[in-house]
């Protein structure tokens, strides 16, 4: 996978991402609800005890910071390390790295937020981390199993790995019509890769269809969210026309004639094994 190309596409989309990435924002909200609900149930923790549980947090693939802000306001960690492949994302989360913006915990302790650019697959995150988490990022990784092992070593003995990614039906319309797209792991395979190092506390998936007036609107949406990161072919007039005609023929819905783009989010909460 061309990580440099992926970073460039997301850098170009950083000013439109928050407006266009509605599914990813919904996923971020659901991710934190699942995390707090699962911990409340599995460890019988009250909301204020969950915040104490996660003193040191790492978020990989923070992007423009939608999930980062939810983490800060919900969990109030002592430290939050934000990572993204795209260095330009520091512009989007820079205000969070200010102690005035990040705020203080209830006991008066300052919340320290920092940004680390680069490929999370190559990093050794700080030892003693309580929570490693992410939304809508893991699908860009070349070797998730090796990354899970690195997380296992970085987390405390009862630390949590909580992430969302996308499953095999994600954007299947684009793959069908172009023959191109990411290789998405099924939820069962993700659990199998995690199982040597983690106990799975929760795993679920869902299908989220989006409706667009035209195939051109689908392509604009993809460009403005940066998720065209692996597509290198140019769109000629003939290729675009053929794509649009087939999209309408195969994926339009009566009576509106709108076309559908499918998202397939997966959510996993896993507890570190000793």
Swiss-Prot record:
One of its GO terms (molecular function) is malonyl-CoA methyltransferase activity. Its EC number is 2.1.1.197. SUPFAM superfamilies: S-adenosyl-L-methionine-dependent methyltransferases. GO terms for biological process: biotin biosynthetic process; methylation. Coiled coil: none annotated. Pathway: Cofactor biosynthesis; biotin biosynthesis. It holds the Pfam family Methyltransf_11. It catalyses: malonyl-[ACP] + S-adenosyl-L-methionine = malonyl-[ACP] methyl ester + S-adenosyl-L-homocysteine. Belongs to the methyltransferase superfamily. Converts the free carboxyl group of a malonyl-thioester to its methyl ester by transfer of a methyl group from S-adenosyl-L-methionine (SAM). It allows to synthesize pimeloyl-ACP via the fatty acid synthetic pathway. This is Malonyl-[acyl-carrier protein] O-methyltransferase. It comes from Bacteroides helcogenes (strain ATCC 35417 / DSM 20613 / JCM 6297 / CCUG 15421 / P 36-108). The gene is bioC.
């Amino acid at each position: 996978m061309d990580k440099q190309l992926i970073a460039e596409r997301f850098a170009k989309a950083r000013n439109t991402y928050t407006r266009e990435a509605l599914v990813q924002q919904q996923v971020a909200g659901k991710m934190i609800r699942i995390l707090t609900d699962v911990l409340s149930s599995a460890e019988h923790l009250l909301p204020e005890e969950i915040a104490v549980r996660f003193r040191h947090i790492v978020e990989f693939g923070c992007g423009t910071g939608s999930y980062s802000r939810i983490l800060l306001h919900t969990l109030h960690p002592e430290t939050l390390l934000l990572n993204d492949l795209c260095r330009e994302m520091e512009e989007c989360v820079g205000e969070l790295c200010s102690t005035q913006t990040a705020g203080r915990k209830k006991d008066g302790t300052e919340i320290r937020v920092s940004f680390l650019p680069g490929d999370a697959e190559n990093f050794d995150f700080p030892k003693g981390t309580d929570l490693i988490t992410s939304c809508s990022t893991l699908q860009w990784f070349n070797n998730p199993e090796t990354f899970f092992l690195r997380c296992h070593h970085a987390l405390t003995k009862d630390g949590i790995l909580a992430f969302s990614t996308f499953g095999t039906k994600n954007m299947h319309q684009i793959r069908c019509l172009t023959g191109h797209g990411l290789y998405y792991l099924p939820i069962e395979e993700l659990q199998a890769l995690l199982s040597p190092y983690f106990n799975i506390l929760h795993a679920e998936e869902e299908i989220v269809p989006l409706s667009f007036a035209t195939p051109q609107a689908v392509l604009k949406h993809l460009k403005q969210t940066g998720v065209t990161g692996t597509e290198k072919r140019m769109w000629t007039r003939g290729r675009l026309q053929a794509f649009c005609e087939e999209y309408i023929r195969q994926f339009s819905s009566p009576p509106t004639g709108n076309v559908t783009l499918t998202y397939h989010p997966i959510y996993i909460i896993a507890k570190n094994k000793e």
